[in-house]
Amino acid sequence: MANSERTFIAIKPDGVQRGLIGEIIKRFEQKGFRLVAMKFMRASEDLLKEHYIDLKDRPFFAGLVKYMHSGPVVAMVWEGLNVVKTGRVMLGETNPADSKPGTIRGDFCIQVGRNIIHGSDSVESAEKEIALWFHPEELVNYKSCAQNWIYE
């Protein structure tokens, strides 16, 4: 598929605890994106500090790392045409109060500190985040039989 890209999506501890893993995966699959990697894990503080390094000078940084380390997360890599941009639209705004109904955050979240999901904000960020969370051999390349029904 031409112009295919990959994005990093992580279901945060609140999304895991609330039993939303299946619903989130379902939405990405139903859209037509292809899951190429997934881990259910408790992220180390070092991994989280590196992941959120751009926010290290913000007053909420320590609390964010502590919260993300408080329970398991589901780290995923999704692939498809415009998956970074479309994935961000599917997630909704960072602040759930600004998210439209029909988005993941608009349907399932109330407060910004418990917004259940992370998604890469650019192709460059996605590449960096995927390399941080996954080894190359953990990314599975395959052709989905549905691909011909999703793309021209």
Curated annotation (Swiss-Prot):
The keyword Iron does not apply. Its EC number is 2.7.4.6. Gene3D superfamilies: Nucleoside diphosphate kinase-like domain. Autophosphorylation at His-118 increases serine/threonine protein kinase activity of the enzyme. Interaction with the SET complex inhibits exonuclease activity. Pfam families: NDK. SMART domains: NDK (SM00562). SUPFAM superfamilies: Nucleoside diphosphate kinase, NDK. GO terms for molecular function: ATP binding; metal ion binding; nucleoside diphosphate kinase activity. It is found in: Cytoplasm; Cell membrane; Nucleus. Its cofactor is Mg(2+). GO terms for biological process: cell differentiation; CTP biosynthetic process; endocytosis; GTP biosynthetic process; nervous system development; UTP biosynthetic process. ATP binds at residues 12, 60, 88, 94, 105, 115. The N-terminus is blocked. The active site is at residue 118. Keywords: ATP-binding, Cell membrane, Cytoplasm, Differentiation, Endocytosis, Kinase, Magnesium, Membrane, Metal-binding, Neurogenesis, Nucleotide metabolism, Nucleotide-binding, Nucleus, Transferase. CDD domains: NDPk_I. One of its GO terms (cellular component) is plasma membrane. Signal peptide: none annotated. It catalyses: a 2'-deoxyribonucleoside 5'-diphosphate + ATP = a 2'-deoxyribonucleoside 5'-triphosphate + ADP; a ribonucleoside 5'-diphosphate + ATP = a ribonucleoside 5'-triphosphate + ADP. Belongs to the NDK family. Major role in the synthesis of nucleoside triphosphates other than ATP. Possesses nucleoside-diphosphate kinase, serine/threonine-specific protein kinase, geranyl and farnesyl pyrophosphate kinase, histidine protein kinase and 3'-5' exonuclease activities. Involved in cell proliferation, differentiation and development, signal transduction, G protein-coupled receptor endocytosis, and gene expression. Required for neural development including neural patterning and cell fate determination. NCBIfam families: PRK00668.1. Homohexamer. HAMAP family: NDP_kinase (MF_00451). This is Nucleoside diphosphate kinase A 1. It comes from Bos taurus.
